[in-house]
Regions:
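Helix-to-loop junction immediately C-terminal to a conserved catalytic motif
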Residues: 61
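Conserved ABC transporter NBD signature motif
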Residues: 69-81, 85-86
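Conserved ABC ATPase "signature" region
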Residues: 110, 114, 121-139
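Conserved ABC ATPase signature
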Residues: 143-147
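Catalytic Walker B motif of ABC-type/P-loop ATPase nucleotide-binding domains
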Residues: 168-172
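ABC ATPase "signature
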Residues: 227-228
Length: 259
C-alpha cells in the first residue's frame, strides 16, 4: 500500500488588511486546510483567482510560515517537519520564477548542484538525466534570456529537480505555454509519477487536470469545498466535466461571488 509522502494538517494563513480610518481586518487566505499526497500520485489544486492556491503551495513548500498548522514529509519510516529538512525533499516551481538570464540552463543547474553540496560528477550526471527527461538538449547551452517561453519553463522545472526531490509542488506549470510545451510538461509529470514521485500542482486548466490527476482538491475562499477522483466528483455532481463540477459546487455551497 502506498504511503502518504507529504502531509498537511489544519493549515491557516492570516493576513492583516488595512481598511479605511486606520481599521485593520484579518483575512484568512487559507482557512483550515488538511491534505496529503501519496507516493506515485498526482493531486491537482483547482480554484479561481484569489482562492488561496499559491499561498497554500508556498506553505506546503516551507517558503511561507503558516499562522496555524503543520506540514511534514514522510521518507521511509521517518516523518520530518523541520523546515530545512523538508525543503531538501521538495522541488517547488513558482508561477513567477525568475531565472538568471545571463546564464545558460546548464550553468544554472551546475550552480544549483554546488549550492546543494553535490559532488561535481553527480551534478553532471543529474544534468544529463534531467536534460533527457525534459528534452533540454537543443538549448541547454543557450543563455536563458534567449529562450522561448516554453523552453524557459522547462529550464525552471529542471531547476527543481537537481537535488532529486521526492515531492514536486508546481504552481501553474503550463500557464501561458503553447500546446507542444504544455504536452511535454504533462508527459514529464506522468513519467515522474511512474517513478514514485509525489506531485501536487495548481492549474486553471480543468481539462488538463481531468486528464492528468489521480485526485482533485477544489478550494474557494481558502477552504476545501470538495475532493476526490475526477470520476467521483463528476458522479457526485452529475456533471460531464470538472468545469461543470466546480460551478455546481460553488452553487451548492452558496458562495457565488464576483468570480
Amino acid at each position: 500500500m502506498k504511503e502518504n509522502r507529504i502531509i498537511a494538517h489544519n493549515l491557516v494563513k492570516t493576513f492583516t488588511k488595512n481598511e479605511k480610518k486606520n481599521k485593520k481586518v484579518d483575512i484568512n487566505a487559507v482557512d483550515g486546510i488538511s491534505l496529503s499526497v501519496k507516493e506515485g500520485e498526482i493531486v491537482g489544486i483547482l480554484g479561481p483567482n484569489g482562492a488561496g492556491k499559491t499561498t497554500l503551495l508556498r506553505m506546503l513548500s516551507k517558503l511561507m510560515k503558516p499562522t496555524e498548522g503543520m506540514v511534514s514529509i514522510r521518507i521511509g519510516d521517518k516523518e520530518i517537519s523541520d523546515d530545512i529538512e523538508v525543503k531538501r525533499h521538495i522541488g517547488y516551481l513558482s508561477n513567477n520564477t525568475k531565472l538568471y538570464g545571463r546564464l545558460s540552463a546548464r550553468e544554472l543547474l551546475q550552480m544549483l548542484g554546488t549550492i546543494y553540496g553535490m559532488p561535481k560528477e553527480d551534478t553532471e550526471q543529474k544534468i544529463e538525466e534531467i536534460s533527457k527527461v525534459l528534452s533540454l538538449e537543443s538549448f541547454i547551452d543557450n543563455r536563458i534570456e534567449k529562450l522561448s517561453t516554453g523552453q524557459t519553463q522547462r529550464a525552471s522545472i529542471a531547476r527543481c529537480l537537481v537535488h532529486d526531490p521526492q515531492v514536486y509542488i508546481f504552481d501553474e506549470p503550463t500557464l501561458g505555454l503553447d500546446i507542444l510545451s504544455s504536452a511535454a510538461i504533462i508527459e514529464f509529470m506522468k513519467s515522474e509519477r511512474e517513478r514514485g514521485k509525489s506531485i501536487l500542482y495548481s492549474t486553471h486548466y480543468m481539462e488538463e487536470a481531468e486528464y492528468l490527476c489521480d485526485r482533485i482538491i477544489m478550494i474557494h475562499h481558502g477552504k476545501i469545498i470538495s475532493e476526490g477522483t475526477p470520476g467521483s466528483l463528476k458522479e457526485e455532481t452529475e456533471k460531464e466535466n470538472l468545469r461543470g463540477v466546480f460551478s455546481e459546487l460553488i452553487v451548492r455551497e452558496g458562495i457565488l461571488d464576483e468570480h
